[in-house]
Amino acid sequence: MARKRKSRNNSKIGHGAISRIGRPNNPFEPCRNRYAQKYLTLALMGGAAFFVLKGCSDSSDVDNDGDGTFYATVQDCIDDGNNADICARGWNNAKTAFYADVPKNMTQQNCQSKYENCYYDNVEQSWIPVVSGFLLSRVIRKDRDEPFVYNSGGSSFASRPVWRSTSGDYSWRSGSGKKESYSSGGFTTKKASTVSRGGYGRSSSARGHWGG
């Protein structure tokens, strides 16, 4: 009588989970994939970067309390998507307002006691502070922005001169109306790192509203 051949596949239930090296896979054991840690690190780095960018873009002070966006040069203003004429007129308007307010016939000591950067003007024969940039705004606020208003392309804009104080901070005449924004003489002073600037980080939706 022929003997019944035993099936080679006599494994018990669960043996199909035996790994190639003969060790059962434990569903509760942490994954040992050598790429897992790398992917996790990249994910955390990406999340951190997103958090930083989002934190910057969500800042409520995107226009320096309504006084405008800061530009160090006309080209910075143009590179931010603004019309060249608006930027040029804004710069010239700010400089005119600034030098009309600067004391005449200042000595070097007097100038450097109030401003970080000064130079001697041979025509005026006086030490004169340097304008560090300007704030540009298209929203004109009553009783706050009138001294800084100018026109371009049939629209009104406001541009304020910005200078550096002896401490290196940015300063300008404020129009925010907030008591905490004022110092002596109605000036706003902010650290360079806290001034809201145009250019990198400015949302695309904010571009093109200046006639660009």
Swiss-Prot record:
Residues 202-212 have a biased composition (Low complexity). The gene is yjfM. Residues 1-25, 165-212 are annotated as: Disordered. The lineage of its organism: Bacteria, Pseudomonadati, Pseudomonadota, Gammaproteobacteria, Enterobacterales. This is Uncharacterized protein YjfM. It comes from the Bacteria. Pfam families: DUF1190 (PF06693). InterPro entries: Biofilm_formation_YgiB.
